[in-house]
């Protein structure tokens, strides 16, 4: 039925993201953060109204709930945090000082700030609303990171803080990058049903070494409690 004088339309608009930027990189895999555009955050939306009816893109759908349906106890929730603290310049050549190309290079884009060996990065995910009876290996962790100095190092990832369970420790020397996706982790790693801390550590013998993190994400079984959030998935 047409909208009455008391009805309203709730409209959600999102800023432009960085997905179209992928084609600008010399290798599209170099892009570590596609949430934010390097060109513009502007997006345009148009709402049109046809008072005569017969709209092209809107049709009335029947929303009939099935009888005797059993509600799902949980769903697999993904939470991804994309950082925009600094604009990392990516790969560099040392010619007396670091010199950067005009090309879109590995690691170039928005990231968290530089992470040095003495200061691990810690990201707390809260509230989880964990469904503890979910799949036994239903926990996943994702990290996109890159080196930011001409040194050797390992990228180390821990669950439950820097001294918690180590789930990844692999070399990422110089300006190389890693897109880490660790699946089928034990759900028992989530010892706290309300929050979890994912820690990223720069393991290097050079105290001034640097790495950057573009994004951190997790997937886990969650109850249908969204804490009054307006946007979730």
Identify the residue ranges that each predicted region occupies.
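Structured catalytic cores of large enzymes
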Residues: 1-233
């Amino acid at each position: 039925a047409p909208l009455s004088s008391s009805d309203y339309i709730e409209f959600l608009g999102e800023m432009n993201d960085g997905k179209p930027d992928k084609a600008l990189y010399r290798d599209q895999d170099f892009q570590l953060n596609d949430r934010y555009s390097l060109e513009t955050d502007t997006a345009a939306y148009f709402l049109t109204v046809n008072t005569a009816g017969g709209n092209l893109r809107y049709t009335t759908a029947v929303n009939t709930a099935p009888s005797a349906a059993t509600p799902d106890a949980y769903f697999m929730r993904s939470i991804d945090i994309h950082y925009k603290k600094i604009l990392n310049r990516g790969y560099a050549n040392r010619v007396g000082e670091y010199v950067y190309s005009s090309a879109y290079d590995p690691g170039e884009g928005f990231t968290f700030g530089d992470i040095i060996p003495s200061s691990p990065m810690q990201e707390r995910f809260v509230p989880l609303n964990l469904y503890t009876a979910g799949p036994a290996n239903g926990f996943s962790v994702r990290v996109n990171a890159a080196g930011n100095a001409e040194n050797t190092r390992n990228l180390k990832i821990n669950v439950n803080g820097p001294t918690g369970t180590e789930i990844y420790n692999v070399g990422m020397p110089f300006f190389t990058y890693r897109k880490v996706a660790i699946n089928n982790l034990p759900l028992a790693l989530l010892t706290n049903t309300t929050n979890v801390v994912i820690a990223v550590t720069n393991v290097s013998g050079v105290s001034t070494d640097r790495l950057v993190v573009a994004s951190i994400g997790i997937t886990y079984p969650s109850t249908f409690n969204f804490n009054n959030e307006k946007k979730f998935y």
